[in-house]
Amino acid sequence: SSDLQGAYALVVSSPRKMIGARDPFGLKPLCIGKRDNTYFLASESCAIAAVGGEFVRDVEPGEIVSFTKHGMKSDKTMAIDPNKQARCIFEYIYFARMDSVIDDVNVYHARIVAGKALAESYPVDADLVVGVPDSGLVAAKGYSEQSGIPYGMAFHKNSYVGRTFIKPKQSQRESSVKIKLNEIGRAHV
């Protein structure tokens, strides 16, 4: 419906039917996977691979897909002009896992390219390029490759601390980062 606004990828499921929808601008990803005769929906292609499934395709911006025992149906009545579509850059540089593919773009490759572009636009005189785990590591590798500055590790991420930038207060974000990241000490190449 045109009443549904904003950025979304949603899935509704019952014992007999599963429905997936993606916002008309394509801001949030949603993809279709299949294993044997079972379809499933996921926000990232890596989730499909993790359960032994085969990536079928991305749900297109503005598309609603439905699955029953009779197969898949597609409704594109909410689709808009592709020139008006947009992607959320945060999906490629932060949210998505590096082993995902979103709208035919390999996330790992996108981060390498972003790091190389950053090195071209903002060269620096430095001894070492380091990234902030996890999403910044690959971009740092791209920066290193383009600039010729060695790449190394300087931080360890506490895997048990969730996303820090979404905390409601700056003081909470700052204290969460202190718990989340530890210096390795002397950075090594």
Q: For the regions a protein language model found, what residue spans apply to each?
A:
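N-terminal segments that mediate ammonia production and transfer
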Residues: 2-136, 144-184
